[in-house]
Amino acid sequence: MLKRHQQLLFRLIRQSVLHQSSPTSSSASSTLLNSENGEKFVKTVVDRLAQCQAGNATAAPEQISYWESISKQSAKVSDGRSELSQLRTIINDPKETEEMRKLAEVDVESIEENLETELQELAVKIVPLNNLDVLSKCQIELSCGAGGQEAMLFTGELLDMYQKLAAVNSWKWDPLQVDNVPLGGVRSALIAVSGEKVYAKMRFEAGVHRVQRVPVNDSRMHTSTASISVLPEPEEVSVVVPSDSVKIEAMRASGPGGQNVNKRSTAVRMTHKETGIAVHCMDERFQHLNIQIAYKRLAAILMQKQVDAMLEKIVSKRKLQVGSKARAEKIRTYNFQHDRVTDHRIQMSITGVAEFLSAGETLQTMIERLQEQHLEDRLDHIIENCIVE
């Protein structure tokens, strides 16, 4: 208290020129950490760490490291809260001069901003990174839904949007299957994408995307849909799908015509023996390339099943669905008439459909907000259940 008072007095003597900043709004993560359950969780972690340091308990080195990071960050949060308390005491003290109280009010805003930052950092420390958070490979599957030709055009626009997003983020974009429509648009597509933390950024694009607009050849508003699936692809396919775990059958490729169709058995069907899951691949001219693609596709499907099984064990109030459940959920509407894109999961609307579809800053902003919501969901689950290990 004395130290804070001396700091304010020194500033007053120097007659510093002070600039007020806008008030800081608390995030959902901060609210959780400031709650009774949040404080209980942090106290439990600090107590467990103290017991280990005193030799009264034991824990794995990685567990102790996790507790230490939370304990150190929570100490910074405690310091910030203490400073705020001291400043508010000065503000409410009638014996203080008006100048001193004004300086304290300005400092309150600055400390609140710093405290919000420290709370956000504490949230990141509490929610540990898992393999999916750092996965550098994923597969994006697009399928046109209701709406006929308009749905195919919209699916093509989404495909272009994600390709531009990949370019912006310097991701590798590898089309595995693309079913283009002669009149324009895409019926379906399967893309392998790789890059730093690509799955973490793309996973919440999974779901039903809806477009509302007036087609060029009509005067009425049309509503069309496209479905997006985002599957995690393992870093090492052979670990998830060993060669002896599958049955590979050669087939003749089918298609509209050409030298290679029905003449050579280049297409393959790969069946996972344990689960019976089968994938077909015939887009490449050479069989070994189709086999490689089939392995990747099967590995992604099996990894998705593992993710689904893991999520089934978690009972929480998550706003964002991850995995197979997300595919049937209507997640976003692109309204051309009102030039607005709305994500229904986080109740976020952004103006500028064209910029959004061109993978501009607005798309990046929405992806970041979805990641923040995911962090909040996981933080809520950990704190509510006091999961300290």
UniProtKB/Swiss-Prot annotation:
GO terms for molecular function: translation release factor activity. GO terms for cellular component: mitochondrion. This is Probable peptide chain release factor 1, mitochondrial. Pfam families: PCRF (PF03462), RF-1 (PF00472). Keywords: Methylation, Mitochondrion, Protein biosynthesis, Transit peptide. The gene is mtrf-1L. Belongs to the prokaryotic/mitochondrial release factor family. The modification N5-methylglutamine is found at Q259. Methylation of glutamine in the GGQ triplet is conserved from bacteria to mammals. InterPro entries: PCRF, Pep_chain_release_fac_I, Pep_chain_release_fac_I_sf, Prokaryotic/Mito_RF. It is found in: Mitochondrion. Mitochondrial peptide chain release factor that directs the termination of translation in response to the peptide chain termination codons UAA and UAG. The keyword Mitochondrion applies. Its main location: mitochondrion.
